[in-house]
């Protein structure tokens, strides 16, 4: 590539490359006639091939992304769910920032593997590219109590970040349902928790540090004209090595789970505003929610939740699943990071036997969207484990699904059956189409790229920024090129 740096002259970096044996029978081909529009997101396998399979030596049935081993290096690497097998022939785990910079500078295409909790090909660099894991870099977490900020390495998981922040008497504004996901990967895809006044996880970011295509180190801070394109960036601008996040004083949360909540007569705005964070669950086997997870800050006025009865036993979001992996319920106050997620940091939420989709639309459409989905619930229910409805405050990140509008998010946890799920995904997208839904970047969707781009007013600004920071296309894989048109 002709890209060199003085710091590369030490005889070559230790990038801890792992050779991967990738066979065609384990890969999605890109010539499938029924291939989906969005960058081959969870496309059906070509005739004569086998679906991707999980490899025991790659994921050890642990937390998302845990257990990915250096041993068994001839076996394919999959995402957490096992529905995507990465086509890269090498997985690199650099042990230092200099090694990472050297690796990027000498590579034609690079994508970063976070916690593996994406369900499409957003992280796949292609057979000629390299896959990079940040897990061997120092997992630094530096809390500045005076400034109320934390600087965190990109590969650190939210569970560890939250624990360290809490030790200093501070807090993040919100967390996602799972605390086991990486910080950099989460903000890059617009991942969020719930709460009418709570922005996505990316809304807490005040500074991004990334390695660009020529191996340079670049820092972009809030206030820079490029900042709103640099946080939720799909990994298309560089390798994010560190982020600085805003913090606030420590707080406690009390979580109460409630039972049946019918759609009939539902005042969605009032229900979603009843607590700091409200998550509503339905299995679409009936016209209503089966559970409401209500998370109240103890330092804010408490509001009643008169629309449903409190649960009398600990609940799991998926009916019938054991609740021991879930966070404390029954209104017992506890630290923010032990209540805002649905799942405990020390337990495994599931073993990956699922697919996921999510669609985010303007919050005033919440009831109309619920009724549109209710009309096709007999189609949804047979392949659904659970659907979660949450709210997210508007933000200014150019590629955020919550960009410019207070948002309601419909999340679907499907069964592990790609062939059965994809037709239902298309039906869901058709039902929600009148409301201009934006799919979660890291989940299964079939929205045509042209339609998707129309829903992001700053898409042209982002593509210009990608051209500026990555003129060689080092970080633009097939997914990014096709979905964003860059």
Question: What function would you assign to each model-found segment?
Answer:
Residues 2, 11-12, 39, 48, ...:
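Residue-identity detector for glycine
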Residues 2-10, 15-19, 24-25, 29-37, ...:
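Low-acidity, Ser/Thr- and Arg-rich intrinsically disordered low-complexity segments
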């Amino acid at each position: 590539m002709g890209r060199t740096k003085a710091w590369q002259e030490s005889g070559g970096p230790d990038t801890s490359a792992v050779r991967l044996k990738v066979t065609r029978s384990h890969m999605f081909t890109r010539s499938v006639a029924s291939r989906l529009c969005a960058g081959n997101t969870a496309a059906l396998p070509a005739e004569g091939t086998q679906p991707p399979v999980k490899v025991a030596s790659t994921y050890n049935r642990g937390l998302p992304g845990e257990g990915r081993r250096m041993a068994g290096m001839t076996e394919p690497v999959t995402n957490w769910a096992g529905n995507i097998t990465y086509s890269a022939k090498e997985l690199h785990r650099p042990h230092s920032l200099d090694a990472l910079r050297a690796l990027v500078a000498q590579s034609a295409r690079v994508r970063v593997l976070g916690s593996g909790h994406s369900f499409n090909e957003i992280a796949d660099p292609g057979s000629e590219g390299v896959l990079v894991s940040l897990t061997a870099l120092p997992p630094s977490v530096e809390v500045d109590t005076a400034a109320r900020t934390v600087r965190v390495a990109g590969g650190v998981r939210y569970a560890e970040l939250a624990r360290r922040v809490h030790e200093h008497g501070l807090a993040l504004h919100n967390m996602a349902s799972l605390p086991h996901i990486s910080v950099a990967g989460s903000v890059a895809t617009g991942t969020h928790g719930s709460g009418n006044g709570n922005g996505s996880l990316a809304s807490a970011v005040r500074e991004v540090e990334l390695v660009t295509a020529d191996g340079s180190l670049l820092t972009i801070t809030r206030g820079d004209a490029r900042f709103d394109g640099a946080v939720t960036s799909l990994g298309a601008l560089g390798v994010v090595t560190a982020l600085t996040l805003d913090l606030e004083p420590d707080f406690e949360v009390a979580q109460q789970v409630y039972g049946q909540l019918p759609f009939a007569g539902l005042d969605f705005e009032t229900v979603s505003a009843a607590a700091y964070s409200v998550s509503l669950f339905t299995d679409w086997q009936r016209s209503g929610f089966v559970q409401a997870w209500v998370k109240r800050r103890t330092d804010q006025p408490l509001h009643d939740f008169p629309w449903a009865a409190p649960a009398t036993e600990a609940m799991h979001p998926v009916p019938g699943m054991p609740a021991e992996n879930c966070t404390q319920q029954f209104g017992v106050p506890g630290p923010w990071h032990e209540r805002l997620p649905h799942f405990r940091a020390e337990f495994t939420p599931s073993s990956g036997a699922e697919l996921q989709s999510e669609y985010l639309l303007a919050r005033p459409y919440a009831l109309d969207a619920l009724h549109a989905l209710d009309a096709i619930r007999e189609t949804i229910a047979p392949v659904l484990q659970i659907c979660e409805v949450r709210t997210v405050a508007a933000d200014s990140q150019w590629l955020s699904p919550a960009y410019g509008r207070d948002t309601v998010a419909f999340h679907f946890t499907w069964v592990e059956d790609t062939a059965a799920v994809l037709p239902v995904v298309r039906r869901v997208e058709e039902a929600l189409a009148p409301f201009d839904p934006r799919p979660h970047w890291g989940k299964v969707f079939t929205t045509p790229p042209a339609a998707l781009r129309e829903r992001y007013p700053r898409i042209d600004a982002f593509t210009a920024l990608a051209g500026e920071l990555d003129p060689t296309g080092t970080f633009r894989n097939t997914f990014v090129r096709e979905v964003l048109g860059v």
